[in-house]
Regions:
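Active-site/ligand-binding loops adjacent to catalytic centers
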Residues: 1-43, 83-183
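Short hydrophobic alpha-helical module
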Residues: 6, 58-61
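Glycine-rich beta-alpha junction loops
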Residues: 6-11, 50, 74-79
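Short glycine/threonine-rich catalytic loop with a Thr-x-Gly-x-Asp
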Residues: 42-50
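A short acidic (Asp/Glu
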Residues: 55, 81-84
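Non-catalytic interaction/regulatory modules that flank or connect domains
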Residues: 60-67, 79
């Protein structure tokens, strides 16, 4: 097990690189990224970009090669962050090729293996216990529920067995709010 920290500056600046026209132009013309790949980068939002960066750090840390595979989840999409891109453009100025070069070099190509920790049993338990505040004090869960997550070997498999019911609730929510109608 491992914990990997990603700086918000990395994922937010890459959000601009992947979604502003000058960033896409830089990736295509200077880096040589295929146009089809560039168009798919908008599938990644801030969290998805952070997940991708975790994979890069993980691969560098373990000195993986082209023969290895690392997978992650695109947990969100850039479509959720158009207003954030506008805010960043307002705060940092219009996005240009020089900014794209900086962002590529510093926030993607320059990813380092700092802020990572291979976890021992006690490290994992210490991180697990950080849930106390958010789960018990904020969400009203019990300490017994937190311990159940740690000690009950069936807790997470039982949770995954609820996927169909959770999907049904998500679909009902989406229908009720009309959230998908505007996408």
């Amino acid at each position: 097990d491992m914990v990997i920290d990603i700086d918000d500056e990395d994922s937010q600046n890459l959000l601009r690189l992947f979604n502003c026209e000058e960033g896409k132009k830089y990736l295509k013309e200077v880096v040589g990224v295929p146009a089809e790949t560039i168009e798919k980068l908008s599938f990644l939002g801030i969290s998805g970009i952070a997940n991708m960066l975790c994979c890069i750090k993980f691969a560098k840390y373990y000195e993986l090669t082209e023969d290895d595979v690392v997978a992650t989840v695109a947990t969100d999409s850039a479509i959720m962050y158009t207003s954030r891109i506008d805010e960043l453009n307002e705060q940092q100025g219009a996005y240009d090729m020089l900014t794209a070069a900086r962002d590529y070099s510093e926030h993607l190509h320059g990813v380092r293996t700092d802020s990572m920790l291979e976890l021992s049993y006690q490290d994992r338990k210490r991180i697990h216990n950080l849930k106390y505040y958010t789960w018990v004090e904020q969400q009203g869960k019990t300490y017994e529920e937190i311990n159940q997550q740690w000690y009950d070997t069936h807790y997470w498999t039982d949770m995954h067995a609820q996927a169909d019911e959770l999907d049904k609730l998500i679909n009902e929510f989406n229908d009720a709010t009309g959230v998908l109608a505007n996408m």
